[in-house]
Amino acid sequence: IREPVITNDQVKLYINGWEDRSKLAPRFELTPGATISPASGTVRDFTTPQTYVVTSQDGQWKKTYTVRFITDLLTEYHFENVEYYTFEGVNKFEKLYELDTDGSKTEWSSGNPGYMIASQAAKPKDFPTAQDDEGYIGKCAKLVTRSTGAFGKMLNAPIAAGNLFLGNFTVELSDMAKSTRFGLPYTSKPVAVVGYYKYKPGNVLIDKYSKEIPNQSDTFDIYAVMYESTKDVPYLDGTNIKTHPNIVMMAQIKERKATDQ
């Protein structure tokens, strides 16, 4: 019901709930000369995740992928689980995830990959999006606006706001707002979005040229968007997530205020 989501070693395919996951035979398109084991088109039981090994044409390179077929998505999120994105053996930033009904992961996305480019020496807890211990019950997601330093100023993006969303983040340096690819398939009609938050505004509000905007205060936003995904519009991004004509429903917080409760 949408394009597969392919990350470093994971492949997620979304299908309708009435499909029988115990007998599926996915077919994979590989680079010329590469092989896959088990073979493309093999019938397998995807009620649990299955692994495939891809071997390069010269046989010198092998990589294992975990493939999942997903029918039902979570509707409750607790931010209790976290793992690290690692680069050259170093834990760079935290990735929050939820456990699906079959024990597999639904990962939250954020703008942390973009911030990693701007602030390569930052520790995981210094990134805009990280896990925190001070949740209403248990853990929570902590979103903080951070400076992107000299690199960010060159791109007229002097700050990076903490954010959290379902979907994918692919860095687009020419237009960072297009880096966010929002959304996962839902087949039910949502009724409401309910949760808890704390918020403290920054001391100074600046524009993309790092100039202070007088007599205005920082603010935040919480919203949920349901939109129709098509071949021409497979996803919405930061440039059109609130304005695109494919939007079917939207919920957005109305009363935004600073609170420590």
Show which residues each predicted segment covers.
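Beta-rich interaction/scaffold domains
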Residues: 1-77
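Extended low-complexity, serine/threonine- and proline-enriched intrinsically disordered segments
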Residues: 210-237
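Extracellular carbohydrate-recognition regions
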Residues: 70-115
